[in-house]
């Protein structure tokens, strides 16, 4: 589990934002509480965490969104365990819904490059507790922009739709809102009959040595939702890579299967390739491949058990990685 930035009093800011909505429409408080472990080379790291999210509507056209994370990390050392604390405000943005086809976003937002950053980073959504090895490509070091964004559905029919997102971010060295000067966007076609989404992304770093990033994604699921495929490929100036992930609910519609229908076998394959080692971009320094095998269990009432085994290979050798976790997702109106 990688954390892009730290903010010592980020959660207080999150709560102060949340508290301003008393006189407004009912805000929603969502998020998760989790306890996860990672074992590598016989050493186990323990991480309890909470990841709250607030959505605060302000009338018919405005909304404020924010997500934070707080965790404690216990890392083994020669004498026992080191302990560290981490808290961060992942994003804090205001949305103006101008038309059914256009939403204007301002503030600190997750970069819409690819799909993983926006869709799968919440711990209650991702099947695996860590992101893909290639995910840092195109994320401008922090995965967060500070500035403006436009997004929406440009066209929609019974057979196809096209959605878009475009951003411009300023450079900021602020501890809570760390970002790089960049611009880019993403476009996606969705075919509801086939349950297929395909799209492409482009990003450009506009500070220091200017760099270009490109990406493409494909998501698909069967009609009953029992099998899902998610995949991305991305390329930057110094590295490129891909990942694809599948999950399967074998007894999705069979109530007679009892507790067995709640098991969810998973598989993820990922590779990264170095073009050079000029930049420190968060991608492994050597060509790396990794296979992840997982088995999740979905309890009633929004509780999941995550478990996975991974084998990672590179020129420096191979390593086994075991990960487990339990995640509870909560969602309720803050007040009425």
Place the predicted regions along the sequence by residue.
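Bacterial N-terminal signal peptides that target proteins for export
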Residues: 1-9
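Sec/Tat signal peptide C-region and signal peptidase I cleavage site
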Residues: 19-23
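Solvent-exposed loop/turn segments connecting transmembrane beta-strands
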Residues: 39-46, 71-86, 140-145, 172-181, ...
């Amino acid at each position: 589990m990688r954390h892009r930035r730290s903010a010592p009093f980020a959660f207080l800011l999150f709560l102060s934002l949340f508290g301003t909505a008393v006189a407004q429409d009912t805000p929603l408080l969502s998020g998760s509480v989790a306890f996860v472990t990672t074992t590598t080379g016989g050493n186990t790291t323990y991480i309890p965490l909470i990841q709250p999210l607030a959505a605060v509507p302000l009338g018919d056209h405005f909304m404020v969104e924010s997500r934070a994370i707080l965790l404690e990390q216990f890392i083994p050392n020669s004498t026992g365990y080191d302990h560290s604390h981490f808290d961060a405000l992942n994003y804090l943005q205001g949305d103006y819904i101008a038309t059914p086809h256009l939403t204007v976003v301002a503030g600190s937002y997750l970069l819409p490059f690819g799909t993983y950053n926006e869709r799968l980073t919440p711990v209650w959504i991702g099947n695996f507790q860590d992101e893909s090895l290639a995910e840092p490509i195109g994320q401008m070091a922090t995965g967060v922009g500070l500035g403006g964004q436009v997004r929406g559905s440009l066209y929609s029919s019974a057979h196809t739709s096209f959605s878009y997102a475009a951003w411009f971010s300023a450079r900021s060295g602020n501890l809570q809102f760390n970002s790089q000067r960049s611009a880019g966007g993403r476009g996606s076609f969705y075919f509801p009959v086939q349950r297929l989404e395909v799209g492409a992304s482009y990003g450009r770093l506009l500070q220091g040595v200017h760099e270009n990033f490109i990406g493409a994604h494909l998501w698909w699921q069967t009609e009953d939702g029992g099998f899902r495929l998610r995949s991305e490929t991305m390329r930057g100036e110094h590295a490129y890579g891909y990942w694809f992930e599948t999950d399967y609910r074998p007894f999705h519609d069979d109530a007679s299967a009892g507790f067995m229908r709640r098991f969810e076998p998973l598989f993820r394959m990922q590779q990264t390739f170095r073009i050079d080692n000029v930049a420190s971009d968060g991608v492994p320094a050597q060509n790396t491949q990794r296979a992840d095998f997982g088995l999740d269990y979905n309890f009633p009432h929004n509780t999941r058990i995550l478990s996975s085994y991974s084998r990672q290979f590179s020129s420096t050798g191979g390593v086994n990685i075991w990960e487990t976790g339990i995640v509870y997702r909560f969602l309720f109106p803050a007040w009425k």
